């Protein structure tokens, strides 16, 4: 009966089932004299079957019986559908709550306050495109004059990217305190991530060590958008020394570079969600706009420079939705 109803989706009345040609060969239970079966339908979808057997006084089922049972089946189908929708809504609410908690945990992993480094003003911000994201930045104190400053971007967005980013943050924090140089730290982190990350995922990373006593920044760029170093009145320098994105090749020989920081110099590190932000005509914000904003705001503090960049991106995007996570870190020597 269920198979027939699934194929035909219409009422079935059998007042003598043993002689019905449609069910030749079926071994009916001896207690079944007659039956009336109607589908329970919701928007052309079969959600159940309502069947009654053996009308009293051994009389045959009628069209009126079928009409009445069809009404009952329709009401029952709606009850079943309402119960299903309620369960789906409850599951959706539970999932939303889990994502909200994940977002809270992720935000708690970001620095809560800017680092206090003598002679420097440092700030960062991360704005996910969804409730949770795959961008993150970190300030990791090493000693009184050394601070690790890093910004990472995991491929993808949403909850999967945020879970991988949590692993990246933990890995970098662990390796920072035990690695002698920036390149060694990135190389060790890459090896660990390669072992624990699926082949279709990767991470871009800008990792740097600020020495506030020597006023130098030693950095290693693992496939990340090249940050800007604004120094003097000339063209900004792009910080591109490093190597491949993380987790692609287990043993990659990363390189590092040391740059000197003079009073007033500004380092701007950003994720591709900044430069690839588009307006309604699909025109990207681009690198040049970052240069223009920073050039006009170099006298401001690090937070002011960040606000200027974010504001310019918002103005450029207009009504276009944010498609990717946006993260910026600014280091300014006073």
Give a label for each model feature:
Residues 90-268, 318-334:
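… and, occasionally, acidic/histidine-rich disordered N-termini of signaling adaptors
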Residues 33-42, 46-48:
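A short, aliphatic-rich beta-strand micro-motif
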Residues 10, 15-34, 192, 249:
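Signal-transducing coupling segments at domain and membrane junctions
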Residues 64, 79-97:
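Short alpha-helical interdomain "coupling" segment at the junction between an upstream regulatory sensor module
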Residues 70-77:
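Allosteric cytosolic regulatory segments
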Residues 206, 257-269, 274-334:
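C-terminal catalytic subdomain
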Residues 33, 49-59, 65, 154, ...:
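Short beta-strand-to-loop transition segments that serve as allosteric relay/switch motifs
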Residues 1-12, 18, 239-242:
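Acidic/proline- and glycine-rich, intrinsically disordered low-complexity segments
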């Amino acid at each position: 009966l269920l198979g027939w109803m699934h194929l035909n989706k219409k009422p079935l009345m059998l007042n003598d089932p043993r002689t019905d040609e449609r069910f030749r060969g079926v071994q009916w239970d001896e207690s079944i004299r007659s039956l009336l079966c109607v589908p329970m339908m919701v928007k052309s979808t079969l959600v159940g079957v309502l069947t009654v057997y053996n009308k009293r006084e051994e009389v045959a089922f009628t069209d009126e019986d079928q009409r009445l049972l069809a009404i009952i089946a329709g009401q029952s189908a709606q009850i079943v559908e309402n119960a299903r929708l309620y369960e789906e809504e409850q599951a959706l609410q539970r999932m939303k709550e889990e994502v909200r908690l994940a977002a809270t945990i992720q935000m708690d992993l970001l620095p809560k306050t800017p680092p206090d480094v003598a002679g420097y003003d440092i700030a960062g911000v991360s704005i996910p495109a969804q409730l949770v994201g795959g961008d993150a930045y970190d300030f990791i104190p090493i000693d009184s004059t050394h601070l690790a400053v890093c910004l990472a971007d995991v491929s993808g967005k949403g909850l999967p990217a945020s879970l991988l980013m949590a692993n990246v943050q933990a890995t970098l924090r662990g390796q920072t305190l035990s690695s002698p140089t920036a390149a060694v730290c990135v190389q060790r982190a890459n090896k660990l991530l390669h072992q624990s990350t699926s082949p279709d995922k990767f991470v871009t990373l800008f990792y740097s060590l600020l020495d506030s006593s020597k006023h130098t920044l030693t950095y290693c760029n693992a496939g990340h958008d090249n940050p800007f170093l604004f120094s003097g009145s000339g063209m900004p320098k792009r910080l591109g020394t490093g190597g491949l994105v993380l987790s692609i090749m287990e043993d990659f020989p990363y390189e590092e570079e040391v740059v000197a920081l003079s009073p007033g110099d500004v380092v701007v590190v950003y994720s591709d969600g900044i430069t690839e932000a588009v307006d309604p005509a699909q025109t990207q914000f681009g690198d040049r706009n970052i240069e223009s904003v920073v050039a006009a705001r170099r006298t401001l503090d690090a937070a002011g420079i960040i606000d200027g960049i974010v504001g310019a991106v918002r103005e450029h995007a207009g009504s276009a939705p944010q498609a990717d996570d946006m993260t910026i870190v600014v280091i300014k020597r006073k």
